[in-house]
Amino acid sequence: MLVAAAVCPCPPLLVPEVARGAGPELDAARSACLDALGVLAAARPDLLIVAGPAGPDDGGPFPPGSFGSFAGFGVDLTVRLGEPPAGSPAPERPLPASLAVGAWLLGLARWDGAPAEGLGVEETLPADRCVRVGADLAARAERVALLVMGDGSACRTVKAPGYLDERAAGFDAAAVRALGSADLAALEALDESLAYELKAAGRAPWQVLAGAARGAGLGGRLLYEDAPYGVGYAVAVWS
């Protein structure tokens, strides 16, 4: 059963070594993410699952001990998602970027609670399948916590990665309201096609969260919302 969830953005720029000179611009986001992880730790889960957007070739489950690298962003930095079980070899498949950022956040927070594993959620996964995946995750253990990585639209300004789309602000506002209030129906209703057009990579992981939270009776709280670089970022906690 899901006992707590944290929603965090997943730009590699969240990692100061990647952001370099622009690092301080996301200090507030990093601080909010750490506060959100504190809520997960306080829930004393038996299992932590980090879920984030992934492409068709790097989705699916990632066992404890999976590694991620930021070499593709010009930084010699490797992270690991939890520890592999004693006596088992380290997993060979690398984490997608979203889960690597999640693993980096857990390292920053010095997570030492429940075992951590990952799930790459294909960005085009239909909403109904996302909900079913979430329900399966919640059934994995008696006390499950989710760290849900994902960004809003990438079309908030003319300098955004997807240029300016007038629909982006409204999409992000609806998503942020749903995340901040743990509104499952509103999350499940996010338009898949519009999210794809707006490059909102968080849509599928957020709908996985909605599926996991069914019947859990969790309340939501928004800790951070902004759109630096024209991309919508939000941090929220459900407990």
Where on the chain are the PLM-derived regions?
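Active-site beta-strand/loop microenvironment that shapes enzyme catalytic pockets
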Residues: 123-172
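Short, hydrophobic/amphipathic alpha-helical packing segments
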Residues: 29-41, 45, 102, 127-134, ...
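Metal-dependent phosphoesterases centered on the DNase I-like endonuclease/exonuclease/phosphatase
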Residues: 162-190
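A short aromatic-anchored loop/beta-hairpin motif
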Residues: 1-93
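Polyanion-binding loop/helix "lid" in catalytic or ligand-binding cores
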Residues: 36, 179-225
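Short, basic/aromatic-enriched C-terminal tail that caps enzymatic domains
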Residues: 229-239
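Internal, conserved structured core segments that host functional sites
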Residues: 87-136, 142
